Amino acid sequence: MNYRTILLLVGWVITLTACHSSPSSVLKKAMQMENVSVDSIFFYLQQIDKPENLSSKEQGDYYFLSYKATLWKTGKPVESLLQTAIHRYMQNGQLSQCLQARIAQSASYLYSNQPDSTLLISDNLLRQQLLNDTLRTQLYGLKRVVYSRNQNYGQALNMADSSRWLTRKNKDTLAYFSASRLYLNLLKKVQKIQVKSTC
């Protein structure tokens, strides 16, 4: 081979590799689309042919993002994606991500009409020391929904009050307004029930 052929071959290889993004960079782009567009998330995730080529830490993010995008698109949780994400997060000591995935798992049991499982996981997670107030508020919200569905409005009211207190503590005005509205609606229900029971 002559010098010119070698240069042409090297240029061709560089062009091919430059056009193909690494799985890690594609995953980052997909994660940036999380609050933008579900279709965009799928567009990027489908470009990752083999998730096993991602680092073990990135695999957790890949499966968790796949789970969320599928849930948002279809309205149905795919438990296997979530289990894989939780496993990867635990394997790599990614405790914060693991907590978020476990909260999603608790919510998925609610979608699957398994309220006792939602309560069990939520109670277990509420004992975690690494839990921040935002995640704690999400868990109180899940428990509130379960108690409301079971018509245990007193407990639902307690959960709504806990959420309201945390959002006020964090000075999150919008979240506080939302939590207060839920609290007041539940309070009205409890008061109606009390009036009916005294009549």
Question: Which positions does each model-derived feature cover?
Answer:
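A "functional boundary" signal
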Residues: 2-5, 11, 16-199
